[in-house]
Each structure stands twice: as structure tokens, then as C-alpha cells.
From Swiss-Prot:
Originating gene: argH
Pathway: Amino-acid biosynthesis; L-arginine biosynthesis; L-arginine from L-ornithine and carbamoyl phosphate: step 3/3
Record Pfam families: ASL_C2 (PF14698), Lyase_1 (PF00206)
Provenance organism: Pseudomonas syringae pv. syringae (strain B728a)
Protein name: Argininosuccinate lyase
Coiled-coil region: none
């Protein structure tokens, strides 16, 4: 069975209709219909400009705009009949417009191609998506600042190689994630600046012979600047790749955070409690409380990484200008944006509800010789070279492993067998509080610095 060629806007050149399977295979309306609002926005701006330069009359413009607004209302009410035989969101809307207002609807596409139309739609859509994502990043950062402020003095072990390294505060750890998200925010803001260039007016690839006013359309659509080259305008997908790159980095950060949350909720760590509403159980093991939200976010990072690689692979072999390959840009881009936004939303809801288990964190920090570096620094202040101090403390740790004693549990006599520079005041250095308070500089883990960083973070968010 074949489609009726008269359904196609380009059917005049063809002597037979498109095969029915090919029509389904090449159609994109099943996924690009989500661009409807931005497609209509672009069409209204285009019609307004055409009237301004005299290609349309004011009456024709008004008829077109009224028709497009009615179509948008139909779509949002679920009353629009999306047709696969019309290929995509653009032709579905144009066909419906012509059905509603007659021949005037056929004038809308004057001076425009689907090539520059879709390039405009995607940029408008992604611009809005980035704004939504930025708001979720800010909301998550607010939750992290709240935890950091409440837990500025809560001591936990810091890790390297997933082994106890030095004591830090839980608040300091939350601020590390705040910093990562700040970079994610900046990358997306930067990406938004570069995508905010208007391709509309590039037409198919070479521009148009009509006396269009691209500056007017640019202003109406809120773009920063008009694109400077028509070939590049219709073929560029750098902005989508750049977004997926920034989204991949953000998802990588969330995946790392997820890994820590999964570890911290486990029976082996028991550092935090997650509320039941963010967890699920097991169909067979009654005791289970599984951290599904962080596990899923960790898993979903792969989808966004895949979107980035998919777009890079899609674009790498394309000559100028537009090619049908570019139809494949939307699904990975849509999925990357959806996944990042939903993951951020889940985290923004979850992070303020985390309950640190103070006693378990402290107990873990007391194990593993977490103040060994503090003892080495103590000896440095006594005039010994750091490398010698490192070796001295290494011997003390070895002794502790053999005797089952932490450094703070050893007597002064035991400690002095490794260096006669060690005096009674060493025990103030070997406490967890002494260790974190000693790191009292910008970026350090001391509670005073955590509180100062929270204030800086609040000021940053307030300025957005």
C-alpha cells in the first residue's frame, strides 16, 4: 500500500507516491511533535515579519496568527490529529492551518524552508529546557547549602581510594557537590549563549530572495543575534552537542554523588538514612530498603553519555548543508534533556531530606588512623623535615595496626618511641575536632570555613 502523493507538500516533482513503509520510516512526527509550541512561536514571528516587509497583508498576518493560536489550543487540549503521512510537526501544523483558514495558510512558508524552521525550533526548545534545568540545579544547590549549614560540625571520614584518609565535616562534603554543580550551571549558561543565535532566514541553505527582516524576527523570538552564514545556520548542531556534553558532565557528577549515597546507606557504612519515599523494597527479601533513586540516576548517566556520542557520530560525516541524517538529532537531545532535568529534580527533592547518622560517621572517622597526617604536621612544626615525619608516623601506624590502637589511643610513652619530639600537647592534635579545626582556610573543612562558604553560596544563588 502506498501513500497518496497529494498529501505531500513536495509531491509535484514525483511520479508515484512514497511507499507506505518508507513514509513511516522517514516520518518524525511521533517524536518532534513536542516542538509544536516553538514551531508555532517561530511561525508567528515569521508571519509578523512577512507582513512588515509587505509579503503578507496585515489581514493575512492576523488570520495566520489567529489560526496558529487556535491550533496550539487544539494541541494542548488533546484535540489535534497528528498524521504520520504529513511527516513532521511542521507540515502537520501547516496542513491544519490551511484546513482552517484556506489559501492564506499556504503563504506562511514564503521565504522559509523546513531546514531553517527546524533549526530555529530546536534552539527555541533547548533554550527553554536549559532554563528549566538551571532552576533545578539551583534548587538542588539550595538543599546542599541547607545540609552544609546544619552539619557544619558533623565529622565524618574523608576518603581516598575509598580508604579512610583524613577527617572532614559532612557540611564540607556537601559543599564539594555544590561546587561541582556551580560549574555545571556555568557550562549550561555558556551553552545557552552560543545556541541563542537565530538561523531563521537561512531558508534551505543559501538564504532567500524575499526582502526579509531577520533583525525583526530575531528580536521577536528573543535571540541574541542573527546567524551570520546561511549554510552554517541550517546545518549547525554544535549547540546540541555542547548541551549534551554539559549534560554528560552534570550527570557524571550526579552519578558520583549517587555512588556515595548508595554506599552511605548500606549496612557497611550506615552514614545516612534516606526517607522511605525515596526507596523501594524487595519482592522476596522483607528486610530490604533499596536506594533506588540514586541507583537509577547512576544508571541513567549512561543514557546521556550515549546521547553525546550519538550526536557526535551523527554529525561527523555530513557535508554542508542540511542532510536527512539530522532528523536523528532530536531523540537523543530530547532524552538527554529529560533525563538530566528529572535526575536533578529527584536529587533536589531528596537531598534536604537526608538524615546523617552522626555517631556512625564519627565512629568511622575514629578508625583508620585518620589523624596520621596531623601527627606528621605536628612533627614538622617541631622542626623535622616532612619526609622524615612521614616515615616516623608510618612506623607509628604500623605499630597501631599490630596492637589494635589508633594514634589517639596510644600513650605518650608509646608515641615517643617513634620520636622524642612528641610531647603531651600532641593529643590535642590527634582529636577529630583538632584535625578539622586546624584546616581553617578558604576551602578548608573547618566548621568556621564551612559556614563562610555557605554564606558565599547563598550570595551566589541570590545573584542568579
Amino acid at each position: 500500500m502506498s501513500t497518496d502523493k497529494t498529501n505531500q507538500s513536495w509531491g509535484g516533482r514525483f511520479s508515484e507516491p512514497v511507499d507506505a513503509f518508507v513514509a513511516r520510516f522517514t516520518a518524525s512526527v511521533t517524536f518532534d511533535q513536542r516542538l509544536y509550541r516553538h514551531d508555532i512561536m517561530g511561525s508567528i514571528a515569521h508571519a509578523t515579519m512577512l507582513a512588515k516587509v509587505g509579503v503578507l497583508t496585515d489581514a493575512e498576518r492576523d488570520t495566520i496568527v489567529d489560526g496558529l493560536n487556535t491550533i496550539q489550543a487544539e494541541i494542548e487540549a488533546g484535540q489535534f490529529d497528528w498524521r504520520v503521512d504529513l511527516e513532521d510537526v511542521h507540515m502537520n501544523i501547516e496542513a491544519r492551518l490551511t484546513d482552517r483558514i484556506g489559501i492564506t495558510g499556504k503563504k506562511l512558508h514564503t521565504g522559509r524552508s523546513r531546514n531553517d524552521q527546524v533549526a530555529t525550533d530546536i534552539r527555541l526548545w533547548l533554550r527553554d529546557e536549559i532554563d528549566l534545568i538551571l532552576s533545578e540545579i539551583t534548587r538542588l544547590q539550595q538543599g546542599l547549602l541547607g545540609q552544609a549549614e546544619r552539619e557544619a560540625e558533623t565529622i565524618m571520614p574523608g576518603f581516598t581510594h575509598l580508604q579512610t584518609a583524613q577527617p572532614v565535616t559532612f557540611g564540607h562534603h556537601m559543599l564539594a557537590w555544590f561546587e561541582m554543580l556551580s560549574r555545571d550551571y556555568e557550562r549550561l549558561v555558556d551553552c545557552r549563549k552560543r545556541l541563542n543565535r537565530m538561523p531563521l532566514g537561512s531558508a534551505a541553505l543559501a538564504g532567500t530572495t524575499y526582502p526579509i527582516d531577520r533583525e525583526l524576527t530575531c528580536t521577536l523570538l528573543g535571540f541574541e543575534v542573527v546567524g551570520g552564514n546561511s549554510l552554517d545556520g541550517v546545518s549547525d548542531r554544535d549547540f546540541a552537542i555542547e548541551f549534551c556534553s554539559a549534560a554528560s558532565i552534570a550527570m557524571m557528577h550526579l552519578s558520583r554523588f549517587s555512588e556515595e549515597l548508595v554506599l552511605w546507606t548500606s549496612a557497611q557504612f550506615q552514614f545516612i538514612d534516606l526517607p522511605d519515599r525515596f526507596c523501594t523494597g524487595s519482592s522476596i527479601m522483607p528486610q530490604k530498603k533499596n536506594p533506588d533513586v540514586p541507583e537509577l540516576v547512576r544508571g541513567k548517566s549512561g543514557r546521556v553519555f550515549g546521547a553525546l556520542m550519538g550526536l557526535l557520530t551523527l554529525m561527523k560525516g555530513q557535508p554542508l548543508a542540511y542532510n536527512k541524517d539530522n532528523q536523528e538529532d532530536k531523540e537523543p537531545l530530547f532524552d538527554a534533556a529529560d533525563t538530566l532535568r528529572d535526575s536533578l529534580r529527584a536529587f533536589a527533592d531528596m537531598i534536604p531530606a537526608i538524615k546523617p547518622r552522626h555517631a556512625m560517621m564519627r565512629e568511622a572517622a575514629l578508625r583508620g588512623f585518620s589523624t596520621a597526617t596531623d601527627l606528621a604536621d605536628y612533627l614538622v612544626r617541631r622542626g623535622l623535615p616532612f619526609r622524615d615525619c612521614h616515615e616516623i608516623v608510618g612506623h607509628a601506624v604500623k605499630y597501631g595496626v599490630e596492637t589494635g590502637k589508633d594514634l589517639a589511643e596510644m600513650s605518650l610513652e608509646e608515641l615517643r618511641q617513634f620520636s622524642n619530639q612528641i610531647e603531651q600537647d600532641v593529643f590535642a592534635v590527634l582529636t577529630l575536632e583538632g584535625s578539622v579545626n586546624a584546616r581553617n582556610h578558604i576551602g578548608g573543612t573547618a566548621p568556621e570555613q564551612v559556614r563562610a562558604a555557605v554564606i558565599r553560596g547563598q550570595e551566589l544563588l541570590a545573584g542568579r
